[in-house]
């Protein structure tokens, strides 16, 4: 299921250039979920192509894999204004698209707080749940979910960088 190119399910459509669709390869059953597209993602129509994407790509490479082995998507498909976190009603509008992207996954990696709130209902500190495997329910399926920091958090926080590197090592093991 893909959003209509003229989607107007929430107010985010007003500021978008492009709907940002998933990127990568779903055949391995591993999906990274980010919060929302940024400026460069909105311009290109692909997730994680800006500064955070370069960090993510570098960490995947360090762990021995790349985008051709995973799928990358976001909780919302249009850029929130001023790069703010997506609002609950915006995530709810995109939820059917996200569920269809996650349905066949074996492992979902949540990159940041917004997707943890959306997929797990968790609104506490990320530090309490990072890299603790959990289970989420997508329709009638239970899927392993690993919450971790958004790549942007690693710019200013060494602890989040180490945690995200550990996440990538776990994903590399799942790919074996």
What are these regions (language model features)?
Residues 48-55, 90, 163:
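Short acidic-hydrophobic sequence patches enriched in Asp/Glu that either
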Residues 51-70:
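The first long alpha-helix at the start of the GST-like C-terminal all-alpha domain
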Residues 67-68, 75-176:
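Glycine/proline-rich loop-helix segments at beta-alpha junctions forming the active-site rim
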């Amino acid at each position: 299921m893909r959003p209509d190119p003229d989607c107007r399910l929430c107010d985010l459509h007003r500021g978008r250039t492009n709907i940002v669709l998933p990127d990568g390869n779903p055949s391995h059953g591993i999906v990274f979920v980010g919060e929302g597209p940024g400026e460069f993602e909105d311009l290109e129509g692909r997730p994680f192509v800006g500064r955070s994407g370069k960090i993510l790509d570098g960490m995947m490479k360090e762990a021995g894999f790349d985008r051709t082995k995973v799928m990358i998507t976001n909780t919302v498909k249009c850029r929130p204004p001023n790069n703010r976190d997506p609002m609950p009603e915006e995530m709810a509008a995109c939820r059917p698209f996200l569920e269809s992207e996650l349905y066949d996954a074996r492992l979902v990696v949540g990159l940041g707080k917004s997707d943890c709130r959306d997929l797990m209902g968790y609104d506490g500190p990320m530090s309490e749940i990072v890299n603790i495997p959990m289970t989420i329910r997508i329709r009638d399926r239970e899927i392993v979910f690993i919450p971790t920091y958004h790549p942007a958090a690693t710019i200013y926080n060494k602890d989040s960088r180490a945690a995200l590197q550990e996440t990538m090592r776990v994903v590399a093991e799942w790919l074996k």
